[in-house]
């Protein structure tokens, strides 16, 4: 019977903490620290997943600010962007850490989709906080001017919230299983994966 994989889940806030230095270089530094902590798992099937709250919030904000120059990006495309960028960081840092420890293994970051139900009530009731924190006055200005949905987050300030529908299945599940069986370290389902309503294109 195949050995079950070790699943490691990294929080998006751990890589880009509120109020911290969150440049790409700073996020690389934190990801590198994490990768070194995973070296002892090099002999086991290893699946790494990650959150993306701060990162996808930044991607949406960047899209909103540039909307007069280039077409705005929908949420699912921004999630895919963060899967690619954060997956790249994890690939690089895991490869470097494993190689330095003399335990080199192939690593693959996989853009992952989950099927969700079009009628999921989460679409009408956004609840997942993303991006940075705002003072109440700025949050209310954003809600009025930019039609953001925002809510107060545990006394720390206001944050943008987006829908988080329940996944029905992981589209790439078989590919993930095949990669793990082949000894590949897999980075997958970042940001809980890109939501996809079967039979529909885009959002």
Where are these regions (language model features)?
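N-terminal glycine-/serine-/threonine-rich phosphate-binding loop
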Residues: 1-49, 59-64, 178-183
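Ligand-binding beta-strand-loop-alpha-helix segment within the catalytic cores
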Residues: 65-185
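Short acidic, glycine/serine/threonine-rich loops at helix termini
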Residues: 18-20, 57-62, 119-125, 197-201
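Short, ordered loop/turn segments at secondary-structure junctions
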Residues: 11-13, 20, 52-54, 61, ...
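Conserved mixed alpha/beta catalytic, RNA-binding, or beta-rich assembly cores of soluble enzyme
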Residues: 15, 185-203
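Short beta-strand segments
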Residues: 7-11, 49-50, 89, 106-113, ...
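Histidine-centered active-site/metal-ligand motif
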Residues: 50-52, 198
């Amino acid at each position: 019977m195949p050995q079950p994989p070790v699943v490691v889940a990294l929080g998006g806030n751990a890589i880009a903490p509120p109020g911290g230095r969150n440049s790409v270089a700073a996020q690389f530094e934190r990801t590198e620290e994490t990768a070194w902590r995973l070296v002892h798992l090099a002999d086991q099937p290893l699946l790494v997943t990650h959150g993306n709250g701060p990162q996808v919030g930044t991607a949406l904000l960047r899209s909103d600010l540039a909307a007069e120059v280039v077409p705005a990006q929908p949420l699912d495309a921004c999630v895919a962007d963060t899967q690619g960028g954060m997956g790249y960081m994890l690939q690089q840092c895991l490869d470097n850490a494993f190689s330095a420890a003399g335990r080199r293994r192939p690593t693959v970051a996989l853009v992952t989709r989950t099927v969700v139900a079009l009628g999921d009530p989460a679409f009408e009731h956004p609840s997942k906080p993303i991006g940075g924190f705002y003072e109440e006055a700025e949050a209310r200005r954003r809600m009025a001017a930019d039609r953001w949905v925002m809510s107060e987050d545990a006394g720390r300030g206001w944050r943008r919230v987006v829908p988080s529908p329940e996944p029905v299945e992981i589209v790439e599940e078989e590919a993930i299983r095949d990669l793990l069986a082949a000894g590949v370290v897999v980075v997958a389902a970042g940001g809980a994966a890109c939501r996809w309503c079967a039979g529909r294109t885009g959002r």
